[in-house]
Amino acid sequence: MSGVNEIRSMFLDYFRKNGHEVVPSSPLVPRNDPTLMFTNAGMVQFKNVFTGLEQRPYSTAATAQKCVRAGGKHNDLDNVGYTARHHTFFEMLGNFSFGDYFKERAIELAWNLITKEYGLDAKRLLVTVYHTDDEAFGLWKKIAGLSDDRIIRIATSDNFWAMGDTGPCGPCSEIFYDHGDHIWGGPPGSADEDGDRFIEIWNLVFMQYEQITKEERVDLPRPSIDTGMGLERLAAVLQGQHDNYDIDLFRALIAASEEATGVKAEGDRRASHRVIADHLRSSAFLIADGVLPSNEGRGYVLRRIMRRAMRHAQLLGAQDPLMWKLLPALVGQMGRAYPELVRAEALISETLKLEETRFRKTLERGLNLLEEASADLSEGDQFNGETAFKLYDTYGFPLDLTQDALRAKGIGVDTDAFTAAMQRQKAEARANWTGSGDAATETIWFELRDKHGATDFLGYDTESAEGVIQAIVRDGTVVESASKGETVQLVLNQTPFYGESGGQVGDTGVVTTESGKLTVTDTQKRGEGLFVHYCVVEEGSVKTGEAAALAVDHARRTRLRANHSATHLLHEALREVLGTHVSQKGSLVAPERLRFDVSHPKPMTSEELKVVEEMANEIIVQNTPVVTRLMSVDDAIAEGAMALFGEKYGDEVRVVSMGQGLHGSKAGKAYSVELCGGTHVSATGDIGLVRIVSESAVGSGVRRVEALTGEAARAYLGEQDERVKALAAALKVQPSDVLGRVESLLDERRKLERELTEAKKKLALAGDGQNGSGEAAREIGGVRFLGRVVSGVEPKDLKSLADDGKKTLGSGVVAFVGVSGDGKASAVVAVTDDLTSKVSAVDLVRVASAALGGKGGGGRPDMAQAGGPDGGRAAEAIEAVAVALAG
C-alpha cells in the first residue's frame, strides 16, 4: 500500500521521465492573478503561459500544487468534516502541455500512469467525454481499449472548461473509479450520479478553442493540455479506502488529535477530529505562505478556518489551545515535500496558539449568547439571520460557527437575512465614504502603455538623462500641451526617475525643455511598466514630442538609497535575532525615515532591538560593495536570495547582495541577499549609521520597526545628547550620572508621597476644623460613629484611612467622604468585625452614594465604597449615614 508521499513522488517522477519539467508548487496566494483569493488549481501559476502573456523555457510541466478552497464559489467549509471528500486544503497533481502534445499523448500518459505505474484495475475505470468530442471518444477506445458503454458522453458544462467569458477553452475528459456495487450511486450522467460509488479521480482538459465573443469560438493555433487529479482522492483509491479521511496522512493527524484530547474519533466526535485535521493543514500552509489571521480578505478566511477548528477542539473538551500541539505531526507528514512548513514552524505554532488563546473568550461568550437566542427553537426551525449577524458584527462570532453549533440541534440559519444585514451595513459604510475618483483615470495609463510601450528606466545607473515627452495628461485627459501653473502628468520614453514600488517612494526633481520647466513632485508606476511623472509647470510651457532634460533630486535620492539598503540589513538582522519565521509584511522607504513591518507574534524586547541594530551597524562599518546581479528567479532562489512575499517578479530579477556575515551560518557568506527592484547605496558604509527609534504593533502577528539612517540618525542622536546635557545641567550632575540622580529623586519622591499620605490621613483622623461634620466620634444608638468629610486624601487612600479609623474606635462605624478637584465625591464606610452581624457597610455606603447623586455601591459587610457626582453634598452624605445608622 503506497503512502501519500510515495504517491506524490511517483507522479512527479513519472512525468519527469516522460520529458516534463517538474515545477514547484506556487504559493497559496497567487502572485500574478489578483482575481483569485487563493490558488485553487494546478493551472493557476500557468495562466499567463496558456494565454500567451508569458513564456517559459519548457513546453511541458508537472506539479503537485497545494490548493485552498474556502471562499467564494469554492466555499466547502460547511461540509468539511461531515463528508468523505470535502477539504479546505488539498493537493492537486497535474501535467501540462503548452502547445506541445495534445489529446492522444495526454490520454496515453494518464492511462499508463494509473494502470501500469499505480496498478489500478482497468475494469474499475470508466471515462467521460464532451458529447461532441468524437476525437477523444475514439482515442479512449484506441489507447485504453474501453468499450463504448464505459466511455460516457456528457452534454453539460461539467465536461467543457473555460477560463472565463473569453479566452482559452475546450472539452474535458474525466476518469472515474468504481468503488463497487456495495456503495450506492450510478455512473456519471445517470439519475444516481450524485452517489458515492463512482468517484472522479482525474480531469483532462483539452484547450483547443479560443472564445472570442459569446457567439464566436475559433481554434487555437497551439492547443494545450491542463490536467488535475486530487492527491487525497487518488490515495484513498490506492489504499483501498472509500473515505479520504481514512488515508495514511489523515490517520496520522487524527491520531495526534485523539492523543492530545484523550477522545477517540468515534460517533459524533468523529467529525470534530476530521475538521481539526483538515483545518490544521489549511491554516498551517496559509501562515507559511504569509497569510496571517485578520478581519478582512485572506486573513479573515484564515481566521474563520482556524476558529471553526478551535470550536471543534472545544467540543472535544480541550481546555487549552490544541492546534499548535498537532503541528509537529503535520510537519512530520508533509515537511519534506513542502519545506516552507519546516521554515515557518515557529511562526505557525505561535500564531495558532495566540489566536486560539484570544478566541476562547469570544467562543465562550458567543456560545452563551447563541444558546440564549436559540432556546425556544426546535429541530427544523430557522435561526434569525439578523441575530446571527449581530453575533458576527458585535461579538466577532462568525456565521460558520453559528451554523456549525446549531447543526447538532437540526436548526438552520436564515442566511438570506444575514446577507441582507451584511449588505445593509456595507451600504451604510459606502454612503459615509467618498472615493477619490482615481479609478476613472486608470484606463488612460493602460491605453498609453499599449500605444507607447513600457518606459525604459535608467535610474539604476544615472540620476540625469534625456527623454522625449510621449504624453501629457491633465485632469484625467490626454492633452497636447500645458502652460505655467498647470498640474499635469508626463509620460516619457525613458527616465531616471524611480516610480514608487517595493515600499520605496517615487523620485522628485526637475524636467526642463526648450520652452519650459517643470517640478516633479512624485513618480508612480502605472499600467504595467509605465512611469508617470506628477509635475507642476513652473516656467513657460511644454508640449508632446519635445525633448526633455530629466534630473532627479540627488540629495533626496541619496537618502532613499541609504534607507532602502538599511531595510535589507534590518530584515536580515531581525531574522537572525528573532528566527527565520520573520518575513517582510510591508515597508516604507522615504527620504526622511524608513518603516518596516515584519511577521512576529509578540513585542520585541529592548535587548533584541539593541542586538538587531548592532548587527546592522556591523555590516555598515564593513563598507563592503553592494553587488547587484540579474538572473532568473529560480537561480536567485537557489543561491539563497530572499523573495518578498506578495511581490511580482518577472523571468529576470535583480538580486541585491550586501555585507559579509560574521556569525553562525552567515559567517563568510553574503550577509543579505534579496530580490529587489529598488535603488541602493554603492557600499554599505554609505548608509552611515542606522538607529531604531520605535517598535510597535500594527496588527495581529505583525510588528513595525521604524528607523533613521545617515544624517537623520546623527541628528536624532545629537538631539538626544542635547536633551541629556540639558537634563544634567538642571540636575547639577555630569551627563553620565543623570540616570542615578533621576532614580534617587524618584525614590525620594515616592518616600515623600508616602509621608504626605500618612500625614493627610492623620490630619483627617485628628480633625482640623475644616473637615466638615464630626470632628470627634459620637455615639448613635449605642454604636460609636466617626464621620468626616476629608480633604487632600486620594480616593485610593480612603480605604486605608477607614481601616485606621476602625482601629481608633476599637468598635464602631467609620464613614469618610473625599471630594476630588472636579467636584466628584468618593465615599467609604467601614464597620468593625464585632458589628457586621448588625450593621452592613454596603447598606450604609449606598445611603451615602444616594446623597451624593450616585447609584449603588458595593463591597463587603465590613468595608464598602461608592461615589457620586455631587461633592458639594459631602457633609449631607455623612449625616445621611448617621441617620441610617440611628434608623
UniProtKB/Swiss-Prot annotation:
Its Gene Ontology molecular function terms? alanine-tRNA ligase activity; aminoacyl-tRNA deacylase activity; ATP binding; tRNA binding; zinc ion binding
Cellular-component GO terms for this entry = cytosol
| UniProt keyword list | Aminoacyl-tRNA synthetase, ATP-binding, Cytoplasm, Ligase, Metal-binding, Nucleotide-binding, Protein biosynthesis, RNA-binding, tRNA-binding, Zinc
Which residues are noted in the entry as Zn(2+)-binding? 564, 568, 676, 680
User: Which family does the entry's similarity section mention?
Assistant: Belongs to the class-II aminoacyl-tRNA synthetase family.
Return the NCBIfam families for the record. Answer: alaS
What the entry says about domains is:
Consists of three domains; the N-terminal catalytic domain, the editing domain and the C-terminal C-Ala domain. The editing domain removes incorrectly charged amino acids, while the C-Ala domain, along with tRNA(Ala), serves as a bridge to cooperatively bring together the editing and aminoacylation centers thus stimulating deacylation of misacylated tRNAs.
Protein name as it appears in the record:
Alanine--tRNA ligase
To which species is this protein native?
Sinorhizobium medicae (strain WSM419)
